[in-house]
C-alpha cells in the first residue's frame, strides 16, 4: 500500500465579513434555521472581523505536517479541502486528480465517531470524488484518534498550562471541566449506540488521569436548534451555574471536543463562558486546543504510518475502552451502524 498525497479535510470557516452569512447558509442548508438565528450567530464571527481562526490554523498545521513528513523522509504533498467554505473539498479533489494523484490518505480534523464527527466526513469524501469524475483518486480516511497517546498528552499538558495561569492559592481546588460540542440526542444514537458520547467520555478519563485529576466533569456546549429538540446535556453554562451555587472558586475548562480554535471555542468559551464565570466570582482558565503544534503533526503522520506499514494502532489503554473506527475507502461507512 502506498499514498501519493495527504488530504486534510476540515469544516471550513469565513475569512472576511462578507463571507460570514454565505458560510452559515452552507452550514445550515436544509435545516430550516431562521435567518434571524443566522444573523445572531454571524455576530460572533463579526466580533473577530468576520474571520474564523480555523482556516489559518489548518494552513499552519499543513506546514507542520509537511515538516514532519520531511523529517521522516517522506515526499508526500498535502492538500487542503473543506466542507462548508473555500477551498471546497470538491475543488480540491478535482485538483488532486488533475495533478495525477491516484491514491491519497485523508485526515479529518475531528477525532470522533458518530455522524457529524465521522460519517459526514465520509460523505464529503464521496462528494469530492463524484465532483472529480471517473479519474478521481482513491481516498482512504484515517482512523479516529481520540485515544492516540499524543492526543491525550497534548490536552493533559494544556490542562496543566491552564492551571498555572490561575491564582496560586486556587490551583489545587480548581474544578476540571471537559467540554465537547453537543448534538441532538437523535443524532447521538446514529453510528453505533451513542458512540460519540462514549468516546468523549473515554477521552476525558484518559486526559484527566494523565493530568493528575481524580475528579472532573464532562459537559456539552454550543447547542443550537429549537429548544424542544433534546440535545446532549448538561450544558456548560448551566453546569457553571451549579458549580457557583456549590461554592466553586476556580475552574479549568478543557475543550476536549475541538482539535482547533473554532468559533465555538474563542466565542462561546473565551467570551461568553469567561464572562459568566467572572460575574459568578469564579477564576477561569481555558486549556488550549492542539491547533498546529508539532505533536499534532506527528499524530497525523503516525496515523499514515499505521496504515502504510500495517502497524498496530498507538492507543492509550484505559478502563472500559471504546472502539475507534473511521478508516474506510472512498467514503464508505466504516462501521455497519453508520450505513443504517
From Swiss-Prot:
Cell compartments where the protein resides: Cytoplasm
Return the EC number: 4.99.1.9
Please state the pathway this protein functions in, per its UniProt record: Porphyrin-containing compound metabolism; protoheme biosynthesis
Keyword terms = Cytoplasm, Heme biosynthesis, Iron, Lyase, Metal-binding, Porphyrin biosynthesis
Q: Which residues bind Fe(2+)?
A: 181, 264
UniProt catalytic activity: Fe-coproporphyrin III + 2 H(+) = coproporphyrin III + Fe(2+)
Share an example GO biological-process annotation for this protein. Answer: heme biosynthetic process
Q: What GO cellular component entries does it have?
A: cytoplasm
Q: Name one Pfam family in it.
A: Ferrochelatase
Signal sequence span per UniProt? Answer: none
Enzyme class, spelled out:
lyase
| Molecular functions (GO terms) | ferrochelatase activity; metal ion binding
The organism's place on the tree of life at top rank? Bacteria
PANTHER family registered for this protein in UniProt: FERROCHELATASE, FERROCHELATASE, MITOCHONDRIAL
**Protein name per the record:** Coproporphyrin III ferrochelatase
Species name: Mycolicibacterium smegmatis (strain ATCC 700084 / mc(2)155)
Amino acid at each position: 500500500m502506498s499514498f501519493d498525497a495527504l488530504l486534510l479535510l476540515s469544516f471550513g470557516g469565513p475569512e472576511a465579513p462578507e463571507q460570514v452569512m454565505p458560510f452559515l447558509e452552507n452550514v445550515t442548508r436544509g435545516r430550516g434555521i431562521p435567518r434571524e438565528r443566522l444573523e445572531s450567530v454571524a455576530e460572533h464571527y463579526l466580533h473577530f472581523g468576520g474571520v474564523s481562526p480555523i482556516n489559518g490554523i489548518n494552513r499552519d498545521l499543513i506546514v507542520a505536517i509537511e515538516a514532519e513528513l520531511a523529517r521522516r523522509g517522506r515526499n508526500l504533498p498535502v492538500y487542503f479541502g473543506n466542507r462548508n467554505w473555500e477551498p471546497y473539498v470538491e475543488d480540491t479533489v478535482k485538483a488532486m486528480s488533475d495533478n495525477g494523484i491516484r491514491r491519497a490518505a485523508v485526515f479529518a480534523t475531528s477525532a470522533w465517531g458518530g455522524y457529524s464527527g465521522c460519517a459526514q466526513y465520509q460523505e464529503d469524501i464521496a462528494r469530492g470524488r463524484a465532483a472529480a469524475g471517473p479519474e478521481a483518486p482513491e481516498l482512504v480516511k484515517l482512523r479516529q484518534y481520540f485515544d492516540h497517546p499524543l492526543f491525550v498528552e497534548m490536552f493533559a499538558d494544556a490542562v496543566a498550562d491552564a492551571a498555572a495561569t490561575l491564582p496560586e492559592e486556587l490551583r489545587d481546588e480548581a474544578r476540571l471541566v471537559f467540554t465537547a460540542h453537543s448534538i441532538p440526542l437523535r443524532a447521538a444514537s446514529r453510528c453505533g449506540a451513542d458512540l460519540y458520547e462514549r468516546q468523549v467520555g473515554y477521552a476525558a478519563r484518559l486526559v484527566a488521569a494523565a493530568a493528575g485529576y481524580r475528579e472532573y466533569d464532562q459537559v456539552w456546549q454550543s447547542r443550537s436548534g429549537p429548544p424542544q429538540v433534546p440535545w446532549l446535556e448538561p450544558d456548560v453554562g448551566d453546569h457553571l451555574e451549579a458549580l457557583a451555587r456549590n461554592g466553586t472558586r476556580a475552574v479549568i475548562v478543557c475543550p476536549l471536543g475541538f482539535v482547533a480554535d473554532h468559533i465555538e471555542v474563542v466565542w462561546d468559551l473565551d467570551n461568553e463562558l469567561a464572562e459568566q464565570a467572572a460575574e459568578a466570582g469564579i477564576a477561569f482558565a481555558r486549556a488550549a486546543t492542539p491547533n498546529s503544534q508539532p505533536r499534532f503533526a506527528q499524530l497525523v503522520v503516525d496515523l499514515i504510518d499505521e496504515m502504510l506499514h500495517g502497524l498496530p494502532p498507538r492507543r492509550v489503554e484505559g478502563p472500559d475502552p471504546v472502539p475507534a473506527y473511521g478508516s474506510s475507502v472512498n467514503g464508505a461507512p466504516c462501521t455497519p451502524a453508520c450505513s443504517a
